[in-house]
Amino acid sequence: MADKFHILLLNGPNINMLGTREPDKYGTLSLAEIVNRLTSEAAALNVSLDHLQSNAEYALIDRIHQAKDNVDYILINPAAFAHTSVAIRDALLAVNIPFIEIHLSNVHAREPFRQHSYLSDVAAGVICGLGADGYSYALQTAVKRLSQSH
């Protein structure tokens, strides 16, 4: 049976360092552990999940552009690009695919420069401060919204 929906998971700079990078803020799970868990959850929901992590803004933008005709929903942890990248915002708007912005830490309880996101006001939703569970909540929400609209 074919997958019902296609979800794209994008992770921005330094997310590849999860598990060892400031575990008090970002938790102890590695990115591979998070992606493996989410891939299993997606399979149980009968949806496909593609993943890209990049420290390069252009690579994330290129993958967003490639998603235009074959992805139903995007889950994105833009990491520091949330606070700096008009280009990622423009790419997301250009493809017109609904997306949920995810942050492991509560960005609103951190430094002032982390409290503004160029993506939040155009996102379908924002999840922050719930650690790795935020990815699961985003996936569940995306599938629920897609199921309701199809």
Swiss-Prot record:
Question: In which pathway is this protein known to take part?
Answer: Metabolic intermediate biosynthesis; chorismate biosynthesis; chorismate from D-erythrose 4-phosphate and phosphoenolpyruvate: step 3/7
Q: Which GO BP terms, alphabetically?
A: amino acid biosynthetic process; aromatic amino acid family biosynthetic process; chorismate biosynthetic process; quinate catabolic process
Q: Which reaction does it catalyse?
A: 3-dehydroquinate = 3-dehydroshikimate + H2O
InterPro entries, per the entry: DHquinase_II, DHquinase_II_CS, DHquinase_II_sf
Pfam families cross-referenced by the UniProt entry: DHquinase_II
Function statement: Catalyzes a trans-dehydration via an enolate intermediate.
Protein's UniProt name: 3-dehydroquinate dehydratase
Q: What is the lineage of its organism?
A: Bacteria, Pseudomonadati, Pseudomonadota, Gammaproteobacteria, Enterobacterales
